[in-house]
């Protein structure tokens, strides 16, 4: 930016005006919790999302929402190639598994060696919302496959936590 003569103030102003595209590091509140929704579609994307949240300098609750609809890809075996083991290096006091394949993603989290007593499976995305609201941390990251993200956003929009538009 310095090469082009753009001041730090102008860069900051640009970032302040920008909006995240839905599901792509979209931020919102659930109750008093600061939440970030990240779309995951394959092992590389999931691993990169995990690398990103690993940079958080605070404890957070992790929710992973896994669906297996046509738009997601029916085969979810890719979760075994994603680096979920990296959660062992993060300050995550609680993890929630949701979506149509909640038991599969819960199993994947258990296999990492993460304390299985800290993993809660949720039958519905509404249950995930309630779990996030009741969590002990101030922050939550929600990693979701495409249709799980759409369904979760629909619930968020009905609670006015996000807009209904899908930019």
Show where each model-derived region lies:
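ATP-dependent carboxylate-amine ligase
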Residues: 2-167
């Amino acid at each position: 930016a310095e090469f082009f003569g753009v001041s730090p103030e102008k860069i900051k102003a640009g970032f302040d005006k920008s909006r995240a595209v839905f599901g792509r590091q979209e931020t919102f509140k659930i109750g008093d919790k600061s939440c970030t929704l990240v779309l995951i579609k394959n092992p590389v994307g999931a691993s990169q999302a995990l690398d990103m949240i690993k940079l958080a300098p605070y404890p957070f609750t992790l929710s992973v929402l896994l669906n297996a609809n046509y738009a997601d890809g029916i085969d979810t075996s890719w979760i075994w190639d994603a680096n979920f083991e990296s959660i062992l290096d993060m300050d995550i006091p609680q993890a929630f598994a949701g979506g149509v394949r909640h038991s599969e993603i819960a199993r994947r989290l258990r296999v990492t060696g993460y304390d299985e007593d800290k993993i809660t499976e949720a039958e519905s995305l509404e249950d995930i919302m309630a779990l996030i609201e009741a969590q002990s941390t101030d922050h939550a990251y929600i990693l979701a496959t495409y249709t799980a993200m759409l369904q979760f956003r629909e619930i968020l929009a009905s609670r006015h936590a996000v807009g209904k538009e899908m930019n």
